[in-house]
Curated annotation (Swiss-Prot):
SUPFAM superfamilies in alphabetical order: BAR/IMD domain-like (SSF103657), GTPase activation domain, GAP (SSF48350), PH domain-like (SSF50729)
Domain Rho-GAP positions: 380-564
Compartment(s) of residence: Postsynapse; Presynapse; Cell projection, Axon; Cell projection, Dendritic spine
GO terms for biological process, alphabetical: actin cytoskeleton organization; cell junction assembly; establishment of epithelial cell apical/basal polarity; negative regulation of proteasomal protein catabolic process; nervous system development; regulation of endocytosis; regulation of synaptic transmission, glutamatergic; signal transduction
Pfam families recorded: BAR_3 (PF16746), PH (PF00169), RhoGAP (PF00620)
Function: Stimulates GTP hydrolysis of members of the Rho family. Its action on RHOA activity and signaling is implicated in growth and stabilization of dendritic spines, and therefore in synaptic function. Critical for the stabilization of AMPA receptors at postsynaptic sites. Critical for the regulation of synaptic vesicle endocytosis at pre-synaptic terminals. Required for the localization of NR1D1 to dendrites, can suppress its repressor activity and protect it from proteasomal degradation.
Any one GO molecular function term: GTPase activator activity
Name this polypeptide is given: Oligophrenin-1
Site (Arginine finger): R409
Length: 802
C-alpha cells in the first residue's frame, strides 16, 4: 500500500493527520535504513568469509527478498514495477548460484558497500538531521506560543509587541524547518528506488561475470539487466523532472502558503483554544478545528485527551459568530460563537489577530481572503501568431540543429529567450523576427519554444482531458493505453489537435536522429510531458503524476503514424487495437521463472595461453580455449555475434522508428555503471542517462580477475542450418553481438498461436524448424528478433503493422 503524498500546505496547518502521515514516512525511512544496514552487513560477510560463502549468499538473498518498496501515489509506472520486483529476482538468482560456489571479486566492496553506505549516511542521515531540527523548532514554537497566549492583555503595549515579534519569528523558523523536512523525506523516499537498486545491480553483474562457472547464468541475466538498467535510467529521468517541479512548488509555497487549497478541503482549519467553565474555575482547552462554510459545520477535535477515555471529534452547527470585546476578557484574539447543539456562548481564542480575522471572515459568510495571488509569468495564447512562432522554430531546428547533441535538454540563456519572445510577440509587429540571425542559436530557439508551450493559458492537451490521459497511461493493459490515448487525442479542440500533431511530428523527426542527438522517445517524453500536459492545481500529488504525463508523450511519439492516420472508430468506449488470444498486459521482467539448464563441466585454462587459440563467443566476452567444442547442446539457442561484423545471412539489428526508418539501437553498458560506482559516484552522467555514448564500446574493468574456462557446447538453432553455427571461427574474426532493442517487450509467457503468422527472415538461413519447448531458448530467440519490432514497453504493441 502506498503512502499518501505530503502536501507542503499541510506544513502550515500541522494537523494531527499530517503528523500521522509524517510518522508513516519516518517509519518507512527507518525500515529502509535498517534494510541498508542489513545489506551492508551481509555483503561484508559475503566478501570476507570465503569459507562460509554459501550460507552468506543465502542470508543475503533472504534479506533482499524480504524488502518491498513502498511508493508515493496510487500507481507505479512499468519501470517502477520492474524496480519494485527487482530484489525478488536478485534473490532467486543468488539461490541458484549458491551451489556453484562462485568466487567473490576483490572490488565487491566498492560496488556494493560504499554506495549504500554513502546513501545511508548522506541521504538518510541528512534526513534524520532535518527531523531533529523540525522537532526542536516545533517544540520551541509551541512552548513559546503557549506562554504567549497566556499573556494578559493588560501588559504594556511594547511588551506585547515584542512577544508578537518573537512568536512570528519562531513560527517562521518552524514552518521553514517543516517544509525542508517534508521535501527531504519525500526526496529520499523517491530516490531510494535507484540509489539502492543500482549498487546491488552492479554488484550482481560483477559477481556473475567474474567466475567462469556462471557463464550460462550470465547469458540469461543480460536481457533482464539491460531492461532493468533502462528502467532505472527512465525512473531517474522522471525523478529529476519531478524534483524540479517540486522545488518550484516549494518556492511558491514559501511566498504564499495558502495558495494550494484542494477541492473538498474545509474552508478554514487550524488550532483554537476553547474556554471551558468548571465549578472550580475556568480552563482553556486546545482543539483542532475545521469549518465548512457551505454547511456551517464546525468540527472540533480535542488535543488534550482525558485519562481513561478517548474523545472523538465534535460536530457543531454554527448559528452566528461575533468578535469578543478586548475589555471584556483578559485573553487576546478571542471571539464568541453560538451553535445549535450547545446552549449559551462558546468563547474561542485564535493564535493571532490575523488568524482571528480569517476565522471571522469564514464564519460570518464574507468572502474569504486566504492568500495574496502569486505573480505569474505572462500567459501565452494558442493563436495564429503562436502557430507561426512554433512553425518557424521547428523549421530552423530541423534545418540547422536536428543533430545537435542534447537537443531540447540543453537550455539557452534566459535573457536571449526573453528577448526573442518579446520581439516575436510584440503587439506592434508580431512575428517580425529573422530566425536566421546569428543572435539566435539553437539552444535559445528550443528554450523559447518550450517556454511558449509551457506558459500557454491552457496546456496543449487541455485541463479537461488531463485526468483521462493520466488514467490511460496508468493502465497495465498495453492495448488499452494506445486505444484510449488515440481516442482522447481526437477529443481535443481543433487548434489544440493541430498544434499537437505539428509538435509530435517534429519530435518524431528529432528521435530519428537519436544516434547523433541522443534524444530517444523516452527522453523527449521527460522534456515535453510537463510542457504539453500539466495539472490545474499545484500540489505534490499532481507532481507525482508527471512520470505518467511523460509516458503519454512517449506513446504519441512512438505510435504517431497509427494515431494520426485517422480518428478511431466511433464507439462508446475508447477503441482497442485488434484483439489477441489473451489481452497483453504489462508484467515485470523476470529471469527466475525460466527452466534450469543442465550445466556443462568447465575446466579452467591458464592465463598464459596464446592468443591464436579458438575463440567462442558468449554475451559477456570471449572464452578462449584450444579444445574443439563438442557438438549438440541440451537446449537450442540463437547464435551470438559481435557488433561490427557483417553476416550475409542476417541484417544488422536496428531500432525501427514510426515512419519506417531504421536506426541502430543503443547499448546499455553496465560496465560504465560499475566504473562509476567504483569511483564512489552515485550520479549517472547526462550522456549515460539520455542515451548511448557515440563510439562507446564494451567497457572492461581491469580489477576483475576472470579465469578463462574451457569451452562449453555450442548451441544449434532448430530453425536454421545447424552446421552454420558449429563452425569454428578464424582467430582474427570477431562475431557480432545481437543486442535487444532499447525498450524490449515483455518476455514470452504463453505459447499462443498468432492470428497472422509472419515469416521470420534474417534469423537463420534455411527452413524454420519446430518450436522449442525451452523457455530460455524461446526468450533468447525473442530478443534476437525483437529489434525489428517497433515501440517500447510503455505502450508497444508487437504485431501492429500500422
Amino acid at each position: 500500500m502506498g503512502h499518501p503524498p505530503l502536501e507542503f500546505s499541510d506544513c502550515y496547518l500541522d494537523s494531527p493527520d499530517f503528523r500521522e502521515r509524517l510518522k508513516c514516512y519516518e517509519q518507512e525511512l527507518e525500515r529502509t535504513n535498517k534494510f541498508i544496514k542489513d545489506v551492508i552487513k551481509d555483503g561484508n560477510a559475503l566478501i570476507s568469509a570465503m569459507r562460509n560463502y554459501s550460507s552468506a549468499v543465502q542470508k543475503f538473498s533472504q534479506t533482499l527478498q524480504s524488502f518491498q518498496f513502498d511508493f508515493i501515489g496510487d500507481t507505479l509506472t512499468d519501470d517502477e514495477i520492474n524496480i519494485a520486483e527487482s530484489f525478488k529476482e536478485f534473490a532467486e538468482l543468488l539461490n541458484e548460484v549458491e551451489n556453484e560456489r562462485m568466487m567473490m571479486v576483490h572490488n565487491a566492496s566498492d560496488l556494493l558497500i560504499k554506495p549504500l553506505e554513502n546513501f545511508r549516511k548522506e541521504q538518510i542521515g541528512f534526513t534524520k538531521e532535518r527531523k531533529k531540527k523540525f522537532e526542536k523548532d516545533g517544540e520551541r514554537f509551541y512552548s513559546l506560543l503557549d506562554r504567549h497566549l497566556h499573556l494578559s492583555s493588560k501588559k504594556k503595549e511594547s511588551q506585547l509587541q515584542e512577544a508578537d515579534l518573537q512568536v512570528d519569528k519562531e513560527r517562521h523558523n518552524f514552518f521553514e524547518s517543516s517544509l525542508d523536512y517534508v521535501y527531504q523525506i519525500q526526496e529520499v523516499q523517491e530516490s531510494k528506488k535507484f540509489n539502492i537498486v543500482e549498487p546491488v545491480l552492479a554488484f550482481l553483474h560483477s559477481l556473475f561475470i567474474s567466475n567462469s562457472l556462471t557463464v550460462e547464468l550470465t547469458q540469461d541475466f543480460l536481457p533482464y539487466k539491460q531492461q532493468l538498467q533502462l528502467s532505472l535510467q527512465n525512473t531517474r529521468n522522471h525523478f529529476s523532472s519531478t524534483r524540479e517541479e517540486m522545488e518550484e512548488l516549494k518556492k511558491r509555497m514559501k511566498e504564499a502558503p495558502q495558495t494550494c487549497k484542494l477541492p473538498g478541503q474545509p474552508t478554514i482549519e487550524g488550532y483554537l483554544y476553547t474556554q471551558e467553565k468548571w465549578a472550580l474555575g475556568i480552563s482553556w482547552v486546545k482543539y483542532y478545528c475545521q469549518y465548512e462554510k457551505e454547511t456551517k459545520t464546525l468540527t472540533m477535535t480535542p488535543m488534550e485527551q482525558k485519562p481513561g477515555a478517548k474523545q472523538g471529534p465534535l460536530d457543531l452547527t454554527l448559528k452566528y459568530c461575533v468578535r469578543r470585546k478586548t475589555e471584556s476578557i483578559d485573553k487576546r484574539f478571542c471571539f464568541d460563537i453560538e451553535t445549535n447543539e450547545r446552549p449559551g456562548t462558546i468563547t474561542l481564542q485564535a493564535l493571532s489577530e490575523a488568524n482571528r480575522r480569517l476565522w471571522m471572515e469564514a464564519m460570518d459568510g464574507k468572502e474569504p481572503i486566504y492568500h495574496s495571488p502569486i505573480t505569474k509569468q505572462q500567459e501565452m495564447e494558442l493563436n495564429e501568431v503562436g502557430f507561426k512562432f512554433v512553425r518557424k522554430c521547428i523549421n530552423i531546428i530541423e534545418t540547422k540543429g536536428i543533430k545537435t547533441e542534447g537537443l531540447y535538454r540543453t537550455v539557452g540563456s534566459n535573457i536571449q529567450v526573453q528577448k526573442l519572445l518579446n520581439a516575436f510577440f510584440d503587439p506592434k509587429c508580431p512575428g517580425d523576427v529573422d530566425f536566421h540571425n546569428s543572435d539566435w542559436d539553437i539552444k535559445t530557439i528550443t528554450s523559447s519554444l518550450k517556454f511558449y508551450l509551457r506558459n500557454l493559458s491552457e496546456p496543449v492537451m487541455t485541463y479537461r482531458l488531463h485526468k483521462e490521459l493520466v488514467s490511460a497511461a496508468k493502465s497495465d493493459n498495453l492495448d488499452y493505453r494506445l486505444g484510449a490515448i488515440h481516442s482522447l487525442v481526437y477529443k481535443l479542440p481543433e487548434k489544440n489537435r493541430e498544434m499537437l500533431e505539428l509538435l509530435i511530428r517534429h519530435l518524431v523527426n528529432v528521435c530519428e536522429h537519436s544516434k547523433e542527438n541522443l534524444m530517444t522517445p523516452s527522453n523527449m517524453g521527460v522534456i515535453f510531458g510537463p510542457t504539453l500536459m500539466r495539472a490545474q492545481e499545484d500540489t505534490v500529488a499532481a507532481m507525482m503524476n508527471i512520470k505518467f504525463q511523460n509516458i503519454v508523450v512517449e506513446i504519441l511519439i512512438e505510435h504517431f503514424g497509427k494515431i494520426y492516420l485517422g480518428p478511431p472508430e466511433e464507439s462508446a468506449a475508447p477503441p482497442v487495437p485488434p484483439p489477441r488470444v489473451t489481452a497483453r498486459r504489462h508484467k515485470p521482467i523476470t529471469i527466475s521463472k525460466r527452466l534450469l539448464r543442465e550445466r556443462t563441466v568447465f575446466y579452467t585454462s591458464s592465463l598464459d595461453e596464446s592468443e591464436d587459440e579458438i575463440q567462442h563467443q558468449t554475451p559477456n566476452g570471449t572464452i578462449t580455449s584450444s579444445i574443439e567444442p563438442p557438438k549438440p547442446p541440451q537446449h537450442p539457442k540463437l547464435p551470438i555475434q559481435r557488433s561490427g561484423e557483417t553476416d550475409p545471412g542476417r541484417k544488422s539489428p536496428s531500432r525501427p522508428i514510426s515512419d519506417g526508418k531504421l536506426e541502430p539501437c543503443p547499448e546499455v553498458d553496465v560496465g560504465k555503471l560499475v566504473s562509476r560506482l567504483q569511483d564512489g559516484g552515485t550520479k549517472i552522467t547526462p550522456k549515460a542517462t539520455n542515451g548511448p555514448m557515440p563510439g562507446s564500446g564494451p567497457t572492461k574493468t581491469p580489477s576483475f580477475h576472470i579465469k578463462r574456462p574451457a569451452p562449453r557446447p555450442l548451441a544449434h538453432h532448430k530453425e536454421g542450418d545447424a552446421d552454420s553455427f558449429s563452425k569454428v571461427r578464424p582467430p582474427g574474426e570477431k562475431p557480432t553481438i545481437i543486442r535487444p532493442p532499447v525498450r524490449p517487450p515483455d518476455p514470452p509467457c504463453r505459447a499462443a498461436t498468432p492470428q497472422k503468422p509472419e515469416p521470420k527472415p534474417d534469423i537463420v538461413a534455411g527452413n524454420a524448424g519446430e518450436i522449442t519447448s525451452s523457455v530460455v531458448a524461446s526468450r533468447t530467440r525473442f530478443f534476437e528478433t525483437a529489434s525489428r519490432k517497433t515501440g517500447s514497453s510503455q505502450g508497444r504493441l508487437p504485431g501492429d503493422e500500422s
